[in-house]
Amino acid sequence: MKYLVIRFRQMGDAVIATCLLNSIKENDPQADVTFVLNQKIEPLFRGHPSIDHIITFTERERHSLWRNFGKMWRVVRRDHYDVIIDMRSTVNTMGFALFSPSSRYRIGLEKSYTRWVYNHRIHRFRKGDTAISHDLDMLRPLGFKRLDPHISLSVTDDERRRYARYLQEQGIDLAKPIVLVGVSAKLDEKRWPLKYMAFITQRLIARRPEAQIVFNYAPGKEAADAAEVYDLCGHDAHIFLGVEAKSQRELSVLATFVTFYFGNEGGARHIMHAHGKPSFVVVSPGRDPRTWIPCDNVPASWASLDELMPPEEQLGLPYDELYARITPQFVWGKVERFLDENGL
């Protein structure tokens, strides 16, 4: 059968959706799977064994009613899909199912305006759901017997060879541990204080003097944050500030060399997890870590304000005050136990 899977979200959400794609291929090995997503994150999914075709939408297309609906119409008129899975089910995505009434399975979310578009509607996100369990629920109308909760990404051997040369040119010894530290975040409300990041970085170095620390950051504000943490660490020689992943695809390649990831919870952590790498993250206040961090055979843990302060007491307090209560001493205690338990 031919499957059209629509996932217009950010990087982390799209990476998590690979559990659904993998499950399709495991249950229907002859499946022809097309993945629809935002153009800017498309390189991350090239060559994925559970994806046969990728269709991208630019920001311009997604934010223009006529361009958006016109392209959705062309997609389902060009090819007939037996199964359409709309993981967002918004006004901006439901055109795929609306323009393809002959598709046997039109699966979407249960919303007030989706009743006449999808012939199989799945409950919206509920308390107790995880991102992975909710994604896999969208396959239940198909009667699949095996649902694979694992997320995955792929890179080529050539990409790894080229990036290995780059790392060595930057002074990295591939025989020694590489610790990737996500020192910043795109959104301020997801960024743990930089001085706390410096504290943990210094503790990681003290624990494993042979470890090589690489910072993950984007250009602009995040790069400035990385430089500030580097300053706070006294320009420690264990930190290789010049090593960069210049794209999401390069970050995926870098992940294959990483021994351990520490940082703010977000898309970078999902990439590490998809490559089977252990991770520990600080979760921003107000987010439930059990929702976003998979519980599978890949070691992963977190520190959350909910462990220190009841959620109802957090209401109304500014983010900087909430983050200040997630002390570096508390986080390091949990990180050290995690490292001990996983032989890191």
Regions found by a protein language model. Give the residues of each.
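A short, glycine/small-residue-rich beta-strand->loop->alpha-helix junction that serves as a flexible
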Residues: I6-A17, I41-L44, D86, K186-P193, ...
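Nucleotide-sugar donor-binding patch of glycosyltransferase catalytic domains
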Residues: L109-Y113, H270-L344
